[in-house]
Structures are given as C-alpha cells and as structure tokens.
C-alpha cells in the first residue's frame, strides 16, 4: 500500500512539474488574464496612475513603456505592462547594445518578473537589420530568465521582397520573437488612406504565416507631422483593416498628445487630438477609441481562434494584394464598391469571413454572394458579442466598419 501510494504520488508530482514547466515556457502571446485576451496596446509611456486609469477605461489592456514604479497602477487597473528601463533600451536614435542591456536585465527581471502585470521587457523600437544580432542576445536572455515574457521589439514599416523575405525573416531567425510587431500610419492630411498600409500588411502577414509567428499592427491615434486627426472611420479602418489580415493585437500611437518622456524623444510640436490631449483630458478620439475597443473585446474570443487563409480587395487593388479569385469563398457583393475580405478557418474547423467597408465617407449595405451554398450564415455582433442569423439584405456597414460572418 505504501509502495503503491508513493509511486502514485511520484507520478502526480512529475505530472505537476511537467505542467508548470510547460506553462512557464508558453510564449508571450499566450499570457493574459483569460483566453479572450486580445492585446490593445497604448504605445506610450506613463508617469502617473491617473493616465493608467484613463487608458484602462478606454479599453487599453497593455502599455508599451511602463517604469517599475508604475507596475502597481497596472495591477490596480488590470493592464499588462511592457517594462521599460533606460539602462536596457537606448535612446530612439541610438543602436541597441546588448552589453549594458544584459548587465541590467538580470537585476530588472529579478526585481519585477513575479509581478502579475509584467508581460514583457522593452528592448528596441524600429531597429535596422544590423541591430538584430545584438537584440537577439538580449532576447535570448529574457527568454532564459523570464520564460513566457515578451522581449519587446517593434519593427518599422516597409514593403517589398527585401522587407518580407529578408528583413522580417532575418528578424525572426535572429531574435526568435513570440510576436512580430510593426507600425504603419496610413492617414495623412493630404492622403485619404495610404496604399502603403495594405502593401505593408500583406508582407507582414505573409512573413507571419511562413514563420508561424502571430503579428500585431500599431496604427495612428494622435495627429502629428502631416498626419491628420483621426476620425471614428479612420480608427475603424485602421483597426479592422489590420484584423481582416489576421492581426492578433493592435497598438495605438500615441495615446497622449505630448512627446514621450522616455527614449530622449524630441517634441514634434503638433501632437494633437490623441485619446488624451496635452493636458491629460479625454478627447473625442478617446470616446471613439473606447467604442472601437469594446467592439474588439466582444469579437476577441473568436478572433483569437481564427487562422487567416486568404485576404483580398474588392474595388481598388493595392500593390502586392489581389482581388477575388475563382477559389474565393465570396463571389461578389451586390452593393458597395470598396471592400476588404478576409477568409479564416476556426480552431473547430468552421469557416468565417470578415468583410470591411474600405470607404471612409460612405456607409454601404453588406450583401455578399458566395461561391457555394451555405444553409446558415451568421454574424458575430460587435455590440453584444453574440452570434445571430445575418440579416441580409438589411445589414449595412459604416465607413471603416467590419462584419464577421460564420458560414455553415
């Protein structure tokens, strides 16, 4: 009896140890409060609790630059933190050096890694390929000392073969990121919506699928330089335009209408109408972004389980993209002229499509026709999070709005 009990106990102990090791080795994308944790990041720094609170109230659940003395506020408002330490991350215009970073990282990780808010450690923004070797050394150290935490590196925009198969592939090979994060700002004062956004995300999606690494897109929420003040439609098209390509997280640059207080970042002069203004007050953009974040949260439990199979445009076809093909699930649309359509397969094997109204000025009815006959077409409501029969032909899409359909 005692011998049998000991063997059983040993088996249980070994099982528990195995589970703990497996959980500890999960990549950053798997970590969150629950299974529907869809990262919505404020790509900004925080200096006070009030800002963290306003971010959380807007639906933000990750912050890109969190000093250690603000982790308590992230815990309080249930926001994940990418920990920032100036001894690890160089100023914005300086190359990354693993030597000082790797001297500081062990001390930093020992001090804060057990804090439940910690989701990763900030290494570098927009590095060129020459910095990947140094970044890889520090990323490896983070993985060793803080398994499951994100060695945070964000890539610059780009497009073309060099960016897709050279730059991103080199990044993945050298730094082994759990997530490919990049930024692209499509809304200019003299541009309706930059074609480069679609070419860039096509290449990122391609690299993401090829390397089996999910991607996040950082979009524009604060006007500066020659970028315009984002409207509700601008926000929707940037966010849904990323998700339709398969993005598994969204970042917002910036949240506060003022310069970063870190990285030695310069004052760009005309930051305006971000979610928080230069005095920390909530703006119309804050209200619009909160509304959009609520929609994404209601869709997140499904979005996180979808694998991107294809994406195509109706109307204007951007560079590096394609239109409807003979293999597309959607054969056409009986109303509207400008759409993006993403095809997905759910973990349970079901087929889904997302249709985005690419028109920034006009609403349109969403009346897709399908290549095959489906007995049940349902939609996941962004306002309720519930699935219901799709009310074709009455369902309309606001400018930049999307609908997620389940086909059976």
Positions of PLM-derived features:
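Bacterial N-terminal signal peptides
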Residues: 13-24
């Amino acid at each position: 009896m005692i011998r049998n009990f000991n063997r059983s106990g040993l088996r249980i102990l070994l099982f528990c140890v195995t589970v703990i090791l497996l959980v500890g080795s999960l990549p950053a994308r798997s970590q969150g409060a629950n299974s529907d944790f869809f990262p919505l990041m404020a790509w900004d720094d925080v200096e006070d609790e009030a800002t963290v609170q306003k971010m959380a109230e807007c639906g933000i659940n990750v912050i890109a630059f969190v000093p250690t003395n603000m982790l308590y506020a992230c815990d309080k408002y249930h926001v994940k933190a990418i920990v920032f330490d100036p001894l690890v991350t160089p100023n914005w215009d300086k190359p990354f050096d693993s030597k000082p970073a790797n001297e500081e990282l062990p001390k930093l990780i020992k001090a804060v890694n057990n804090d439940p808010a910690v989701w990763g450690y900030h290494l570098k923004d927009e590095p060129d390929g020459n910095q990947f070797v140094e970044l890889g050394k520090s990323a490896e150290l983070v993985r060793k000392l803080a398994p499951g935490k994100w060695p945070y590196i964000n890539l610059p925009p780009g497009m073309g073969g060099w960016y897709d198969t050279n730059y991103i592939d080199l990044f993945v090979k050298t730094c082994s990121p759990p997530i490919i994060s990049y930024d692209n700002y499509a809304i200019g004062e003299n541009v309706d919506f930059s074609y480069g956004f679609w070419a860039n995300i096509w290449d990122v999606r391609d690299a993401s699928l090829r390397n089996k690494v999910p991607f996040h897109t950082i979009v524009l929420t604060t006007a500066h330089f020659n970028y315009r003040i984002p409207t509700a439609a601008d926000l929707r098209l940037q966010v849904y335009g990323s998700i339709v390509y398969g993005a598994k997280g969204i970042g917002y640059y910036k949240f506060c209408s003022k310069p970063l207080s870190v990285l030695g970042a310069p004052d760009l002069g005309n930051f305006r109408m971000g979610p928080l203004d230069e005095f920390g007050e909530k703006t119309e953009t804050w209200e619009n972004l909160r509304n959009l974040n609520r929609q994404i949260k209601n869709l997140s439990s499904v979005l996180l389980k979808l694998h991107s199979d294809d994406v195509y445009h109706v109307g204007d076809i951007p560079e590096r993209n394609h239109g409807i093909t003979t293999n597309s699930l959607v054969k056409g649309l009986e109303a509207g002229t400008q759409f993006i359509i993403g095809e997905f397969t759910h973990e349970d094997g079901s087929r889904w499509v997302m249709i985005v109204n690419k028109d920034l000025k006009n609403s349109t009815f969403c009346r897709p026709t399908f290549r095959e006959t489906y007995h049940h077409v349902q939609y996941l409501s962004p306002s309720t999070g519930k699935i219901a029969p799709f009310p074709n032909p009455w369902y309309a899409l606001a400018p930049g709005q999307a609908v997620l359909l389940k086909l059976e």
